Amino acid sequence: MSTGLRFTLEVDGLPPDAFAVVSFHLTQSLSSLFSLDLSLVSQQFLSLEFAQVLDKMAYLTVWQGDDVQRRVKGVVTWFELGENDKNQMLYSMKVCPPLWRTGLRQNFRIFQNEDIESILATILKENGVTEWSPLFSEPHPSREFCVQYGETDYDFLCRMAAEEGIFFYEEHAQKSTDQSLVLCDTVRYLPESFEIPWNPNTRTEVSTLCISQFRYSAQIRPSSVVTKDYTFKRPGWAGRFDQEGQYQDYQRTQYEVYDYPGRFKGAHGQNFARWQMDGWRNNAEVARGTSRSPEIWPGRRIALTGHPQANLNREWQVVASDLHGEQPQAVPGRRGSGTTLDNHFAVIPADRTWRPQPLLKPLVDGPQSAVVTGPAGEEIFCDEHGRVRVKFNWDRYNPSNQDSSCWIRVAQAWAGTGFGNLAIPRVGQEVIVDFLNGDPDQPIIMGRTYHHENRTPGSLPGTKTQMTIRSKTYKGSGFNELKFDDATGKEQVYIHAQKNMNTEVLNNRTTDVINNHAETIGNNQMIAVTNNQIQTVGVNQIETVGSNQIIKVGSVQVETIGLVRALTVGVAYQTTVGGIMNTSVALMQSSQIGLHKSLRVGLGYDVKVGNNVTFTVGKTKKDDTGQTAIYSAGEHLELCCGKARLVLTKDGQIFLNGTKIHLQGKEQVNGDSLLINWNCAASKSPPKTPDEKQDTPDMREY
C-alpha cells in the first residue's frame, strides 16, 4: 500500500510505469484550453520515437496514498528528449485537451439556418471531440447565415460561444478517467458547491481540504453596453438595446461600450447586450486563493467557511486554477524536500454567471467574386426582395444550387419606393460581393463582371464605341436591347424589342427628324387620336394602299387642293352621301367615263348652268318621262335633225322647215286661223338662234 502524495502518468501504447513524474504544471481557466506541462524521467525507455508519444492520450493522476485526488486526461501535443546519462532519460511533455486539435484546422465555411448547438456539434465531431455536453438554459435561435472566415475551428468556436454567452470547461471525473467538455450558459448548471474551510496554516497535508490564502479584489470595468443593428426588412426599427452592469456601486456609470453592428435582427439583441455586459465585467470582482487541494478547478463551485471576514464566507465560482506539483525524488540520486502540491486559483461570486469577453470577428479584406446559383434548369432565381444566392469561390461544402448561400441583397443603380432601377443577376453570372462593415455574415452584391465564358455583347475591341444594355429572353435565345454607338460619323441609338414594345406618354411627345424617317410594319398598324390630328407635308406625299382603303369621317371632311387633283380608279368608284352633297368648281370640271354612266335621283333633279350647256351623244339619246315633259326656252327653242328644223320663238311664232313635210291624221287634222296662206310665198325661214345672231363660233347653218 502506498502512502503520501504522489503523481503518476500513463500514455496510451506504453507500459503504465514507462514514465515517472518529476514535476507538472496544470493551467486551467474557463473558456480556454488547459495546458499540462510535465517533466518526466524514464529508466525503462532511454530512447523513444516521437510517433510512440505524440498525438497519444496521456493520463495524469494525483494520489494520496491509494486514493485518487485528481485525474487529468489529454492529448500529447509536444514531446522533448532531454538528458541521458545511460541509466535514465529525462523527457518533457505538453498535454492539452482533445479540443486543442480544433486550433490546427483553419477553414472558410458557411453554416445556414443552424443554432449554436448544431454548429458546435459539427465542429467538435469533425475534430474527434465526442465527449461533450451542452447545458443551455437561454434561448439560442438559429442563424440564417453564419460564416467561419479564415479562422481556426477553435477561434471560431470561442467567438461564437462568446457571442451567445456560453462558457466551456473540462469536467474531470475524480474516480475514473472519464472527462468531457461542458458548454454552459448559466452558473446554475454547475455542480453543487462543496465547503472548504479557511486555514492559514500552509503546512497542511494535501488530504486536508482547506484554503490557506484568500484575497478579494475589485476593479473598474465597463458599466453599460449599448448595441445597435439594422435590418432592411424593418428599416424604421430602432434596433437598439441597452444593458446596465450589476454590482458597480464602487465606480461611475459613464463607461459605456457602444457596439455596432450588434449582429442581431430582432428582440434577441437584448440577450446579446446582456451577455456582452457579463463578459466585459467577468473580472470586475475576483478573489484569488491558495490551497494544497487539487479538487479546485474551473467549472466547480466552492463554499468558503471560517474566514475571519464574514462577507467572504459564501459560494464562489472557480474561473481559473494553476496547479503545480513537484516530485524531485522521482529522479534517482536527486534529493529534494519531498512531494509538494500547490493550487493557486481564482473565483468570482457564485451569484453571477461568468461569461467570456466579446471576441473580435474577422473582417473581409475587400470585395470578392462569386457565381449566382439556383435550382437546376432555372435561369432567374430570386425572392420578393430581388435577392439571389451565390456560390463563393472559397466554399467547399455547399453545392451550386438554390441552397448555396443565404439570400443576398443586390445593389441597384437607383432604389426608391416603387421606382428605381432593377436588374436581377441571373444564374451563372459572376457578381462582385462586398460585405457590410466587413462582416462575412452580411454579404451584399455591389456589381457584376464578365469572364471568359460570359462574354460581352458585341465583339471587343471592335465595338468599343458602343454602350449597350442587352437582356436575354427567359429560357430562350432572344433579347431586348438599347445601344448607343459613339463611332465618329456613325453615331446611333439602337432599340431592339424581341416581341412587343409599348410607349406610354402622359402628356406631350415630340419627335424631330432632321432628315429622313422610314417606318416598316410587317402586319397591321392602328392609330387612335382622341381629339385632333394635323398632318403637314412640305412638298409631296405619296400614299399607296395595296388592297382596300376605307375612310370614315364622323361629321365634316374638308379637302383643299391648291392647284390640281387627279384621281385614278382602276375599276369602280362609288360615293355615298347620307344627306346633302355640294360640289363647287371655280373654273372647269371635266368627267370622262369609258363605258357607261348612270344617274339616279330619288325625287328631284335640278341643274342650273350660268351660260351654255352642250350634250354630245355619239349614237342615241332617249328622254323618257313618266307623266309630263316640259321643254322651256326664254327666247328660242329649236329642234334640228339634218335639214329639218322646228323653231319656237318667244313672240309665239312656230317655224317648221324641211325638204318634205308630211302631216298625217289617222282620224282627222284640224287647223284654225283667221288667215291661212298656202303656196303664196307667205312663209318665212326660221330665225337664227340668239348666239347665231351674234356670229358666235358655234353658229350653225341649215
PLM regions: where:
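Polar/acidic, low-complexity leader/linker segments enriched in S/T/G and N/D
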Residues: 1-19, 209-211, 365-371
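Short alpha-helix capping/helix-loop boundary micro-motifs
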Residues: 37-48, 281-292, 414-420
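Surface-exposed cap/loop segments at beta↔alpha junctions
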Residues: 48-133, 137, 142-146, 171, ...
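Short, well-ordered loop/turn sites that connect or cap secondary structure elements
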Residues: 52-53, 296, 312, 425
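Extended, domain-scale alpha-helical bundle/helix-rich regions
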Residues: 85, 114-131, 138, 146-350
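Glycine-rich, acidic and aromatic/proline-enriched surface loops and short helix-turn segments
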Residues: 96-98, 113-135, 258-271, 375-403, ...
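Structural signature for extended repeat/solenoid scaffolds and their inter-repeat hinge/linker regions
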Residues: 175, 180-186, 365-657, 662-664
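Acidic, low-complexity/disordered segments
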Residues: 309-370, 446-452, 456-467, 684-687, ...
